[in-house]
Regions:
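Activation-segment/catalytic-loop signature of the eukaryotic protein kinase fold
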Residues: 77
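C-terminal lobe helix-coil module of Hanks-type protein kinase domains
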Residues: 175-277
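Protein kinase catalytic-loop region centered on the HRD/HxD motif
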Residues: 120-130
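Activation segment signature within eukaryotic-like protein kinase domains
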Residues: 114-115
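Conserved short submotifs of the Hanks-type protein kinase catalytic core
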Residues: 81-95, 99
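Activation segment of protein kinases
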Residues: 145, 151-181, 185-188
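AlphaC helix of the eukaryotic protein kinase fold
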Residues: 43-65
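Protein kinase glycine-rich loop
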Residues: 14-20, 25
Length: 323
């Protein structure tokens, strides 16, 4: 992988932006234009894996399909380089995670402005049959005027794309605090998966913390499947009923009970008088049988399950406890 100061073709690496299991991301400069760019270098050993190779090509296809301010365009693809890399449009803005670290609970109007702008971008993606599947504060940039950008389409899905893992045997595709129940269960996800993440994010903007969290990732995922978060109106006064109802519907465990897509969520945000307030008192039954807290907190148990894959881990744990 390159280092700051290195030149790759006609790009100069200026600073690291992040690193994941399959790629390292840097800010750079295009020497031809002088403009800042983002360079995403893929681990060539990972590209030998069919799943990583397919995701690389999905990201290229999706980047070329989406044309809207707030979504980074793919400017260049160097598949034959060593290591292979993409060049993406550089997006200005402050990470939503950084904003929340400075001010964990946002004023209600600001939270609604951010989530509405974000949901509108996601709705555009859904219109193009693209599902991000990893929406979280780290992947959202907010400018001083409140405009929003979405970054990192690395695990995004284009509807109809071939499956790259066995059904039910998917690895961790997403971030535990922001994963939808269907992702945890090894499903591919779709528009309702992004809707669930939008509900989680709005909850966090208003409550000051994610609805589900634990030092143990398996415990966090189990909470998504079976636990109910503390109601927003008990955490903080002054939250309108329609906002709490929108969050409740977006976060329903069963995807068919959520908003159909981000466009329907935007419509609810724009027309609060049409929001069904009965959602506030509607139960959301667990998706699996109760799991012993002592068991899921046992490090040896968790370690063994992670070895067989995240989605399978949750299902195996549930099966063991039903015996």
């Amino acid at each position: 992988m390159p280092n700051p100061g290195d030149q790759v073709d006609h790009y100069v690496i200026t600073r690291p932006l992040g690193r994941g299991g399959e790629a390292a991301v840097f800010q750079g400069q295009d020497l031809r234009t002088g403009r800042p760019v983002v360079l995403k270098f893929f681990d060539p050993t990972q590209l030998g894996e069919i799943a990583a190779y397919e995701r690389f090509h999905r990201e290229v296809t999706i980047g070329r399909l989406l044309h809207r301010p707030g979504i980074p365009a793919v400017l260049d693809v160097r598949e034959d380089a060593k290591p292979p890399y993409l060049v993406l449009e550089y997006m200005e803005g402050q990470s939503l995670r950084t904003i929340l670290q400075d001010s964990p609970r946002l004023p209600v109007p600001r939270a609604l402005q951010i989530i509405t702008n974000l949901a509108e971008l996601v709705a555009y993606c859904h219109e193009q049959h693209v599902y991000h599947r990893d929406l979280k504060p780290e992947n959202i940039l907010v400018d001083t005027d409140g405009s929003v950008r979405i970054i990192d389409f690395g695990i995004a899905l284009l509807d109809g794309a071939p499956r790259v893992t066995w059904r039910g045997f998917s690895g961790l595709v997403g971030t535990p605090e922001y994963m939808a129940p269907e992702q945890i269960r090894g499903e591919r996800g779709g528009p309702q998966t992004d809707v669930y993440a939008l509900g989680l994010i709005l909850y966090e903007l208003l409550a000051g913390h994610p609805p589900f969290h634990s030092p143990n990732p398996l415990s966090t995922m189990y909470q998504h499947l079976n636990m109910s978060p503390e109601p927003l109106r008990k955490i903080r006064s002054g939250i309108p009923d329609y906002v709490a109802a929108i969050v409740a519907k977006a976060m329903r465990r069963r995807k068919e009970e959520r908003f159909v897509d981000a466009g329907e969520l935007v419509a609810a945000l724009r027309h609060p008088e049409q929001v069904d307030l009965s959602l506030l008192d509607r139960p959301d039954p667990p998706l699996s049988s109760p799991m012993s807290e002592s068991l899921i907190k046992n490090p040896l148990f968790v370690l063994g399950l992670v070895a067989v894959g995240t989605a399978v881990a949750v299902l195996v744990a549930e099966a063991l406890l039903r015996r």
